[in-house]
Amino acid sequence: MTLNLCVLTPNRTVWDSKVNEIILSTNNGQIGVLPDHASIATAVDIGILRIRLNDQWLTMALMGGFARIGNNEITVLVNDAEKSSDIDSQEAQQTLEIAEANLRKAEGKRQKIEANLALRRARTRVETINAISELVGVPE
């Protein structure tokens, strides 16, 4: 049995295909979703979406939004999303370093909040690339 996963941003459909399982970062922690999961709607945090497709794990960086799960259908609506295969590791690392520097330089509450969000996004992109090696040990 499979799930139909659809990941949408305001500008495009990032994923629309059947999957075996996902692990989703929510505002309350990570949740695993298998076929026949209970119906829920949840906020999606800036974090990594892990997708099991047959015997292979794939990852995607999600930049916050909402998810609806029910009847073996998962719809994820996010501000932005990138598959790990689409992320340039050097560019992601440079963006992370810039975000860290900007957070150190931030003055005032608003600048610090914006810099912290940029850092979380940059860190998630780097972690998404590195997450595949971690998934090798995930039991099926």
Swiss-Prot record:
Membrane topology qualifier: Peripheral membrane protein
Gene Ontology molecular function, alphabetical: ATP binding; proton-transporting ATP synthase activity, rotational mechanism
Bilayer-spanning residue ranges: none
Subcellular location: Plastid, Chloroplast thylakoid membrane
InterPro entries: ATP_synth_F1_dsu/esu (IPR001469), ATP_synth_F1_dsu/esu_N (IPR020546), ATP_synth_F1_esu_C (IPR020547), ATPsynth_dsu/esu_N (IPR036771)
SUPFAM superfamilies: Epsilon subunit of F1F0-ATP synthase N-terminal domain
Signal peptide range in chain numbering: none
Superkingdom classification of source: Eukaryota
Family: Belongs to the ATPase epsilon chain family.
Assembly with partners or alone: F-type ATPases have 2 components, CF(1) - the catalytic core - and CF(0) - the membrane proton channel. CF(1) has five subunits: alpha(3), beta(3), gamma(1), delta(1), epsilon(1). CF(0) has three main subunits: a, b and c.
Function: Produces ATP from ADP in the presence of a proton gradient across the membrane.
UniProt name for this protein: ATP synthase epsilon chain, chloroplastic
Organism whose genome encodes this protein: Panax ginseng
Gene giving rise to this polypeptide: atpE
